[in-house]
């Protein structure tokens, strides 16, 4: 196990197209860190730079106590798991697991020990003599993980490994990956564009945007105190409602809110908005009169899509099945402790 340190890492193509813009990050020994962001944000490029599959333009990357800028991928003591399983179709599962170890001249007894240990942990013991075409997608992904595990590397690098799986299997596999990582205690870097995967798996999240880090923290820190409007809308589903400074008063900040001078953006999450019944006092954080446009029942709760008086959308959540009707006018509010205020530059200004 080893820590991974990135110090002002940059990557440019053609000398003037910079895709990684001075990223600095320290990943602790045994930590599970998820790089998350939209397509094109640089997360896979950054992972490939750690792996040595992409050169770096400037800065340093260290794995353990060793700077690996000029170290070949095979010598970095890392193991990668990709979106495509990359299994040899003519080999059995056992042979796929053993292949890399044989190339490294690992003793036969040690190979068998590692295969047995990985197969037991991944529950693929009964598949060892099968070939990849005889396995399901989830089983193939387990074999791909097993091939990484038998390496006993200093770090695991995962590049969107669950993208090819259906929704139910993705949920199962993300739990298995996290359980396995905890039992092995191996430093892990995981790339995904799926914020649900990121939130449920990470010890810490790294949100990337256009080649730079927007925010680093635990999932709950990023959810409760997003550092920018970008993080606020990317983390959480449905995303946070963001309202610009009102010109014609389609909504009102509550009495407990102090607003910055100049332009600002006001944020409130759907679950923090409540319907105010007749006779209820205004909320101390946020108030608005809205028209209901659509209701989504998603099991134990409903999401109500509404419109402010200026036509801007507002989404809020209610428990159970909503009894409200389309085109109904309702008054909504939120507590001051649940609102988020961002300055004109999009950065957080509220505590």
Curated annotation (Swiss-Prot):
GO terms for biological process: carbohydrate transport; glycerophosphodiester transmembrane transport. Pfam families: ABC_tran, TOBE_2. GO terms for cellular component: ATP-binding cassette (ABC) transporter complex, substrate-binding subunit-containing. Its main location: membrane. This is sn-glycerol-3-phosphate import ATP-binding protein UgpC. Belongs to the ABC transporter superfamily. sn-glycerol-3-phosphate importer (TC 3.A.1.1.3) family. It comes from Brucella abortus (strain 2308). The complex is composed of two ATP-binding proteins (UgpC), two transmembrane proteins (UgpA and UgpE) and a solute-binding protein (UgpB). One of its GO terms (molecular function) is ATP hydrolysis activity. Part of the ABC transporter complex UgpBAEC involved in sn-glycerol-3-phosphate (G3P) import. Responsible for energy coupling to the transport system. It comes from the Bacteria. Keywords: ATP-binding, Cell inner membrane, Cell membrane, Membrane, Nucleotide-binding, Sugar transport, Translocase, Transport. The gene is ugpC.
């Amino acid at each position: 196990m080893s820590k991974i340190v990135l110090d002002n890492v940059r990557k440019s193509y053609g000398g003037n197209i910079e895709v990684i813009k001075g990223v600095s990050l320290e990943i602790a020994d045994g930590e599970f860190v998820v790089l998350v962001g939209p397509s094109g944000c640089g997360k896979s490029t950054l992972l490939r730079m750690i792996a040595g599959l992409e050169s770096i333009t400037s800065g340093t990357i260290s794995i353990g106590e060793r700077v690996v800028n000029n170290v070949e991928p095979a010598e970095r003591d890392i193991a990668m798991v990709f979106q495509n399983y990359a299994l040899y179709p003519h080999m059995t599962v056992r042979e796929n697991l053993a292949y890399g170890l044989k190339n490294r001249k690992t003793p036969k007894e040690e190979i068998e020990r590692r295969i047995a240990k990985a197969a037991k942990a991944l529950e693929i013991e009964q598949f060892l003599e099968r070939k990849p075409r005889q396995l399901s997608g989830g089983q193939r992904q387990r074999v791909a993980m097993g091939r990484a595990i038998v390496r006993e590397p200093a770090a695991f690098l995962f590049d969107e490994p669950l993208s090819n799986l259906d929704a139910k299997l993705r949920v199962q596999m993300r739990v298995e990956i996290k359980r396995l990582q905890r039992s092995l205690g191996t430093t892990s870097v995981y790339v995904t564009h799926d914020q649900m995967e990121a939130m449920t798996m990470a010890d810490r999240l790294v949100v990337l945007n256009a080649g730079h880090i927007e925010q680093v923290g635990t999932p709950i820190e990023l959810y409760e105190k997003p550092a920018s409007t970008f993080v606020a809308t990317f983390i959480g589903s449905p995303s946070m409602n963001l309202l610009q400074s009102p010109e014609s008063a389609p909504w009102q900040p509550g009495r407990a809110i102090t607003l910055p001078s100049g332009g600002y953006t006001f944020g409130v999450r759907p679950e923090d908005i409540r319907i105010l019944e007749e006779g209820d006092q205004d909320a101390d954080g946020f108030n608005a009169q809205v028209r209901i446009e659509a209701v989504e029942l998603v099991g134990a709760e409903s999401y109500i899509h509404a419109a402010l008086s200026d036509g801007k959308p507002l989404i809020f959540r209610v428990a159970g099945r909503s009894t409200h009707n389309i085109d109904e006018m309702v008054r909504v509010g939120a507590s001051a402790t649940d609102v988020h205020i961002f300055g004109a530059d999009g950065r957080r200004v509220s505590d």
